[in-house]
Amino acid sequence: MTSKELNEKLLQAIPELKVSFNDFTSWQEGIETGSHTIFENIVVPFSIDIIENEKDDVIGRLFKLVEEMIVSKDEYAQEVVQLSFLEPLKAEHGDEYDFSKIMLKETYSLFSSLEF
């Protein structure tokens, strides 16, 4: 999967990110901006916002997408999730929230295995 494909999939699953995505990527490569950059700089802060504001529908859609990326056979998608979403999420917010109630099985398993 390319960054463009992954970004399109993200925006399809989470249309609430479109404005932030467009603002952030307007001075970069647009839809082809690297997914590592997108997930770490847009999706991580967005996920904390939706958790804090208890937007359960959006939380569910986001973590369903993350789970699909983890269980996919696509190495790039798996790498983006681990390195640019789960690792920063755990490093910055791992002790603040009960992610076991939010994340799906494989996502939480990978998240729990990360050490900081």
Language model features with spans:
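Alpha-solenoid HEAT/Armadillo-like helical repeat scaffolds in large eukaryotic proteins
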Residues: 5, 9, 27, 68-69
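Extended alpha-helical scaffold segments
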Residues: 20-21
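HEAT-repeat alpha-solenoid elements in large eukaryotic scaffold proteins
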Residues: 35-46
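Amphipathic alpha-helical binding modules
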Residues: 75-116
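N-terminal leader/targeting peptides and immediately adjacent processing regions
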Residues: 1-16
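Core helices of alpha-solenoid repeat scaffolds
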Residues: 59-63
